[in-house]
């Protein structure tokens, strides 16, 4: 038994319509894409629901569940609740959640103008307003018959949820999905009874909420709202609050979010990026609390139980909603209530989890390979069968390997050639806007130092040392080093490494040319722009390939920051030389250019440090595992962590 002393407000039960939630924590709606292409419940989906419930939340919400599976969905493999045959799978999910300690909700949604559409099957929307200012696409402005049809679909899906044993559902009125499209002046250009004034724009969404309430009078209904859309001419706080005041007649919880999934910069608030501050929507929730009678839930860059306790105790919200924090560490609640909050793995806000949806793949995490897995590492190795494993490299991959191996019970010797752990992540976390990644790095180093591995710093590993140590297995995680190509003038004093610049080890003057349009170069450019420098970024690749591979919402945010700080981007420029006058380039047409500056920053990518790996792979028939950047170029933090974890659990 654990006394409720650390977080007394968080663990105060909440009863609504006879349904008691054991605490004030909700696992936020997330799109996990673990159902079949037809939306049928799979064993993988059931396992994921069990994993979510075991986090310790009061209830979890399955995100973005379309009310018209073929026409209103945004992704393949979303949960299908649109036919009675789906009730069986829903019931299994709800039962699985309850058996593992949580209630389960489903977020009923219609993507409106963002739905999958074809010429013969256009997307339904209040008006024919295109997405992100792009081409119109196939959109049909809804008539009364369309509205009646969609309203009935919300009702029918809610009834199926009730028949499946769910006690709570969510209606998605946020992020410029269909109901929010009616609310927003940016997407509702109608001139009839459903457009123009706020009263008219509320008419259809309120009619849906009213119909659902009448159909399921005993269910708890949560309504998700964007406090503001962060979109030109979009919904603002005051009108949103007025809608919430009207909506509370039909719903039991108002859930405060923010943003517009269908407008570039507005989308960066729906799934907040690493540039966003903490507790993004708490001030909005506090305003809602002043005007609403029903409980208020709040989501958005909330990362800990301590924050949740402070929010609830201050009366700013009744329920605190998180998702990424639990994805990063499913034991966040359990560690925190036992007084070990410092051991909670912090989310980096890299959005590798959300980006999976854009590629049609299921949910995953860059720093937590255990996401969704019911796996006890301590049981994988039988007593007496422990191995001695040599881990070479103290970057993210090496640290993940060491921690995983130690949890399995193996003896671990970790070797790092420099005087500190972290590898190139030390450079990647310097900028002020990299706080979340910096906290993760600090956590990773602490956990590695405390895991019981033998740590050998300032030790370069050779094949002879491996032979001398004579381990049972070796994990090579030697990482990569910055590219320093043989370009004329590259040794000039004006030419700086991105590492030296980011760590402020060298002056750069007021005008800077960053050579490299990858993520590292562009983040360096933003950092310099924040410091008031005039920055130009050049690369041989075309502009559309700048920061290629970066998760979508963070990419949008990064482009916004580059524009905000006046960074000039020049693609298609091959560097031919450096001189005192500038960086000399030639474009695809053969035209020469010169970009002057006080400093030229090299951010031309990295190359694998794989010489040792190749030697060991050729010398030993087995027992050598190669992970992370030393495998190939173009790797991410996620690659290092995932590969190191899976290499470690293969050693038994």
Predicted regions and their residues:
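A short helix-to-beta-strand connector/capping loop
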Residues: 316, 448-455, 491-494, 562-568, ...
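Rossmann-like dinucleotide/flavin-binding elements
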Residues: 383-416, 457-470, 477-494, 499-549, ...
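Short gly/ser/thr-rich secondary-structure transition/capping motifs
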Residues: 5-14, 371-375, 454-460, 492-500, ...
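Flavin-dependent oxidoreductase catalytic cores
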Residues: 1-392, 396, 404-407, 508
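Hydrophobic, well-ordered secondary-structure elements that form the walls
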Residues: 254, 288, 311, 323, ...
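Rossmann-like dinucleotide-binding cores of NAD(P)H-dependent redox enzymes
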Residues: 414-450, 527-573, 631-634
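Conserved beta-strand termini and adjacent loop/short-helix elements that scaffold enzyme active sites
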Residues: 299, 368, 458-460, 498, ...
């Amino acid at each position: 038994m654990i006394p409720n002393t650390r977080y007394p407000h968080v663990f105060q039960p909440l009863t609504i319509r006879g349904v008691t939630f054991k605490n004030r924590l909700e696992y936020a709606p997330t799109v996990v894409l673990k159902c079949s292409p037809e939306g049928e419940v799979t064993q993988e989906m059931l396992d994921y629901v069990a994993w979510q419930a075991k986090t310790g939340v009061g209830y979890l919400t399955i995100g973005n569940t379309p009310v018209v599976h073929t026409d209103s969905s945004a992704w393949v493999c979303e949960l299908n609740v649109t036919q009675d045959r789906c009730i069986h799978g829903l019931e299994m999910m709800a039962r699985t959640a309850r058996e593992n300690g949580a209630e389960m909700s489903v977020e009923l949604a219609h993507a409106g103008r963002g739905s999958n559409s074809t010429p013969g099957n256009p997307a339904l929307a209040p008006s024919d307003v295109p997405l992100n200012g792009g081409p119109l696409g196939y959109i049909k402005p809804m008539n009364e018959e369309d509205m009646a049809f969609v309203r009935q679909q919300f009702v029918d899906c809610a009834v199926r949820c009730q028949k499946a044993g769910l006690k709570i559902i969510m209606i998605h009125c946020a992020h410029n999905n269909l109901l929010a499209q009616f609310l927003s002046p940016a997407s509702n250009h109608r001139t009839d009874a459903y457009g123009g004034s706020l009263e008219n724009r509320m008419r259809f969404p309120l009619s849906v909420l009213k119909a659902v309430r009448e159909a399921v009078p005993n269910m708890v209904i949560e309504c998700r709202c964007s406090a503001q859309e962060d979109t030109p001419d979009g919904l603002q706080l005051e009108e949103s609050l007025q809608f919430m005041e009207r909506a509370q007649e039909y719903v039991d919880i108002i859930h405060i979010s923010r943003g517009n999934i269908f407008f570039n910069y507005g989308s960066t608030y729906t799934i907040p990026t690493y540039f966003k501050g903490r507790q993004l929507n708490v001030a909005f929730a506090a305003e809602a609390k002043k005007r609403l009678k029903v409980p208020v839930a709040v989501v958005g860059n909330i990362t800990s139980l301590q924050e949740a306790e402070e929010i609830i105790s201050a009366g700013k919200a009744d329920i605190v909603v998180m998702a990424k924090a639990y994805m990063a560490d499913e034991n966040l609640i359990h560690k925190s209530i036992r007084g070990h909050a410092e051991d909670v793995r912090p989310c980096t806000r890299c959005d590798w989890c959300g980006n999976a949806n854009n590629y049609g793949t299921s949910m995953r995490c860059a720093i937590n390979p255990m996401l969704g897995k019911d796996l006890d590492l301590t049981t994988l190795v039988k007593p007496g069968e422990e191995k001695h494993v040599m881990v070479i490299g103290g970057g993210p991959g090496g640290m993940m390997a060491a921690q995983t191996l130690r949890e399995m019970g193996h003896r671990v010797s970790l070797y790092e050639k420099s005087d500190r752990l972290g590898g190139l992540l030390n450079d990647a976390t310097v900028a002020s806007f990299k706080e979340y990644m910096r906290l993760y790095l600090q956590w990773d180093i602490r956990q590695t130092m405390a895991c019981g591995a033998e740590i050998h710093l300032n030790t370069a590993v050779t094949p002879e040392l491996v032979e001398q140590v004579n381990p049972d297995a070796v994990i090579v995680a030697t990482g990569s080093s910055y590219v320093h190509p043989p370009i004329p003038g590259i040794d000039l004093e004006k030419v700086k490494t991105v590492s030296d610049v980011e760590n402020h080890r060298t002056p750069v003057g007021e005008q800077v040319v960053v050579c490299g349009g990858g993520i590292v170069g562009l983040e360096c450019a933003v950092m310099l722009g924040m410091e008031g420098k005039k920055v130009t970024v050049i690369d041989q690749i075309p502009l559309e390939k700048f920061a290629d591979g970066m998760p979508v919402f963070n990419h949008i945010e990064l482009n916004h920051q580059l524009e905000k700080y006046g960074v000039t981007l020049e693609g298609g420029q091959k560097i031919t030389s450096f001189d005192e006058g500038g960086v000399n380039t030639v474009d695809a047409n053969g035209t020469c250019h010169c970009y002057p500056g006080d400093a030229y920053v090299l951010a031309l990518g990295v190359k694998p440090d794989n010489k040792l790996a190749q030697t060991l792979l050729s010398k030993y028939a087995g027992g050598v595992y190669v992970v992370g950047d030393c495998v190939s170029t173009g790797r991410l933090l996620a690659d290092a962590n995932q590969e190191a974890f899976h290499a470690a659990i293969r050693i038994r």
